[in-house]
From Swiss-Prot:
This is Endo-1,4-beta-xylanase C. Residues 1-17 form the signal peptide. Its EC number is 3.2.1.8. Strongly inhibited by wheat xylanase inhibiting protein I (XIP-I), and by proteinaceous endoxylanase Triticum aestivum xylanase inhibitors I and II (TAXI-I and TAXI-II). GO terms for biological process: xylan catabolic process. Transmembrane segments: none annotated. InterPro entries: ConA-like_dom_sf, GH11/12, GH11_AS_1, GH11_dom, Glyco_hydro_11. Optimum pH is 5.0. The active site is at E119, E210. GO terms for cellular component: extracellular region. Residues 35-223 form the GH11 domain. Pathway: Glycan degradation; xylan degradation. The lineage of its organism: Eukaryota, Fungi, Dikarya, Ascomycota, Pezizomycotina. It comes from Talaromyces funiculosus. Interacts directly with the wheat xylanase inhibiting protein I (XIP-I).
Length: 223
């Protein structure tokens, strides 16, 4: 009986001794997974993250543990989201997860360079619309167990990391979709350069989920 009473006293003491610590832990866990619905950038668990939306529909972005993020969208306008690095380099990217679009959406290693200003996509998967439709392939690059068609187009007076600008957009589009694997970005950058597609100083690079006038969900972990 004395042992039983002692155990009760110890449990009661523990329950009263640590409420603030438990609250701090709960608050910390909540902040790590706080949902975001307006455009912002920042750092989370050692990774750069970027979330941009034009405000259309319902889009909710959530930073998870380490390199994980998730995003859900319903009848969205246009958004881009993801985790990665800033500044980036010609690095090898590994990612895994789930990508479940209904309509037009992209899963890509996505980023920018400056001087010159360039927006680029290494497209791993997409929804109902292939963004290379209507474009002429400039060539191909074989990398990481797959073949990618290369495209270039110009964007005129469009949003960019330098405000509304005119800039080149480069694409490597994987011929067989996948969700998960390794992307050796240096192979794509070298192939683009060989075709005369010049890049500048690396800005940010993320594994991006992007949606346009669609619905869906995506949970991705980068490393």
């Amino acid at each position: 009986m004395k042992l039983f009473l002692a155990a009760i006293v110890l449990c009661a003491t523990a329950a009263t001794a640590f409420p603030s610590e438990l609250a701090q832990r709960a608050a910390g866990d909540l902040s790590k997974r706080q949902s975001i619905t307006t455009s912002q950038t920042g750092t989370n668990n050692g990774y750069y993250y970027s979330f941009w939306t034009n405000g259309g529909g319902e889009v909710t972005y959530t930073n998870g543990d380490n390199g994980e993020y998730s995003v859900t969208w319903v009848d969205c306008g246009d958004f881009t989201s993801g985790k990665g690095w800033n500044p980036a380099n010609a690095q090898t990217v590994t990612y895994s997860g789930e990508f479940n679009p209904s309509g037009n959406a992209y899963l890509a290693v996505y980023g920018w360079t400056t001087d010159p200003l360039v927006e680029y996509y290494i497209l791993e998967s997409y929804g109902t619309y292939n963004p290379s439709s209507g474009l002429t392939s400039l060539g191909q690059v074989t990398s990481d167990g797959g073949t990618y068609d290369i495209y270039s187009t110009q964007r005129v007076n469009q949003p960019s990391i330098e405000g509304t600008s005119t800039f080149n957009q480069y694409w490597s589009v994987r011929t067989e979709k996948r969700v998960g694997g390794t992307v050796t970005t240096a192979n794509h950058f070298a192939a683009w350069k060989a075709l005369g597609l010049e890049m500048g100083t690396y800005n940010y690079m993320i594994v991006s989920t992007e949606g346009y006038e669609s619905s869906g969900s995506s949970t991705i972990t980068v490393s």
